[in-house]
Amino acid sequence: MAVRVALHRHVGRAVEVMHLEDQDAVASLCGYRNADALVAALSNAGRSVSWVGDEVWARVASAKTKPVADQLLAPGVILHLGEIHLDETVDPATDPTLLLRVAASAARHKARIDRPTLDRLAQSCPPMPSPWPVGAIDDFVGLLLTAHDAIPVLEALDQRGLWVKVLPEWAPNRSKPQRNAYHRFTVDRHLWEATANAATWADRVARPDLLVLGALFHDIGKGYPGDHTEVGVTMVERIGPRLGLNADDTQMICAMVKHHLLLPDVATRRDLADSATIMMVAEE
């Protein structure tokens, strides 16, 4: 509401859309240090409101679901009335991989994670150790390969502070705005959307696991000072071994991060019919 009032004051009339050119002035009127801080706060508030609303309506729908037998999806993970629950006997504090099993199961079955289950995980689940336990990366990649079905699950984890337990490097990218004409989404949502789109190509490549991991990490450096591509490569050099990737796979993802701007830059700035352009891309 405060931002809306400030926008009206700045523009001088009742408008409902804050354009790029208005953001600096509105940020100043609202007491934010800059427009990035304002847009990040708006994004964070909007996604929280949206998530809470979705949770409420999901509970309403669940209450109308006809009882069916519970289904064991993975160790400690149960599908109950269309929602993902933890078995009462499991202790999240002793099993850091439980979080990934829950998330992967939810995405595969297009199910929401029960709110008390999210609360238990948020309160008790430890950060992923380094290196990850054997098999954890399989659940992680399995989650990402569910494409757009993964996004509501990732949002639920993020709302409860669980996603950064999986990837602590994610925190500076959370709700980070991209104030340009090339991006629709904040950095974090952009990475999720890119990963979901990449997952739809899984049957066209030999290593779909590397495809989705490269998509997830291609802009991971944007939340940090410096050239985001160079920073991202350095980060993936650390992240890959922690996840359990071997040296060759880690370097493949580093190459994806390093060159993710190559083709867009060539397509928009170079003569595609020029043999020198073709040679340059091949050499890169």
List each model region and its residues:
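Non-catalytic interface/linker regions that flank or bridge core catalytic/transmembrane domains
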Residues: M1-A181
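Divalent metal-dependent catalytic cores for phosphoryl transfer on phosphate-bearing substrates
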Residues: A2, G12, S28-G31, T186, ...
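Generic helix-packing signal
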Residues: L7, W57, K110, A198, ...
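Long, K/E/R/D-enriched contiguous segments that form extended
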Residues: G135-G214, G223-T229, T234-M235, K258
